């Protein structure tokens, strides 16, 4: 039986792969794929405008290849975790 943290990490990985590769490289998220992931998997996603998602994509895309790789996605999750932690204080 997997521990809750194992399950949570597995879910984060599975969500990345659920959206990556719908178009182009199956190991990265395009802008369209990232937008869909954010809008469907995060409560705040429905509230974000296209310009905000584009700005987020630009911030996440450290190597400027117009895609978000898994490492960049993990950095995004880390930033989200910090925000959630602050909200709980």
Curated annotation (Swiss-Prot):
A GO biological process held by the record: cellular response to virus
Cystine pairings recorded for this chain: none
Binding site for Ca(2+) 2: 61, 63, 65, 67, 72
GO function terms (MF aspect): calcium ion binding; calcium-dependent protein binding; monoatomic ion transmembrane transporter activity; protein homodimerization activity; S100 protein binding; tropomyosin binding; zinc ion binding
Domain EF-hand: 12-47, 48-83
The organism's place on the tree of life at top rank: Eukaryota
Keyword list, A-Z: Acetylation, Calcium, Cell membrane, Cytoplasm, Membrane, Metal-binding, Nucleus, Repeat
Binding site for Ca(2+) 1: 28, 33
The protein's assembly and partners: Homodimer; head to tail assembly of 2 subunits. Interacts with CACYBP in a calcium-dependent manner. Interacts with ANXA2 and ANXA11 (via N-terminus). Interacts with SUGT1. Interacts with TP53; has higher affinity for TP53 that is phosphorylated on its N-terminal domain, and lower affinity for TP53 that is phosphorylated on its C-terminal domain. Interacts with tropomyosin. Interacts with FKBP4. Interacts with PPP5C (via TPR repeats); the interaction is calcium-dependent and modulates PPP5C activity. Interacts with TPPP; this interaction inhibits TPPP dimerization.
Function: May function as calcium sensor and modulator, contributing to cellular calcium signaling. May function by interacting with other proteins, such as TPR-containing proteins, and indirectly play a role in many physiological processes such as the reorganization of the actin cytoskeleton and in cell motility. Binds 2 calcium ions. Calcium binding is cooperative.
Name of the protein in its database record: Protein S100-A6
Taxonomic classification: Eukaryota, Metazoa, Chordata, Craniata, Vertebrata
């Amino acid at each position: 039986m997997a521990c809750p943290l194992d399950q949570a990490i597995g879910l984060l990985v599975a969500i990345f792969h659920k959206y990556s590769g719908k178009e182009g490289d199956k190991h990265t998220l395009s802008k369209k794929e990232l937008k869909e992931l954010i809008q469907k998997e995060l409560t705040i996603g429905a509230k974000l405008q296209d310009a905000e998602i584009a700005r987020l994509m630009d911030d996440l895309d450290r190597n400027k290849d117009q895609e978000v790789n898994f490492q960049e996605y993990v950095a995004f999750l880390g930033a989200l975790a910090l925000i959630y932690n602050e909200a709980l204080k």
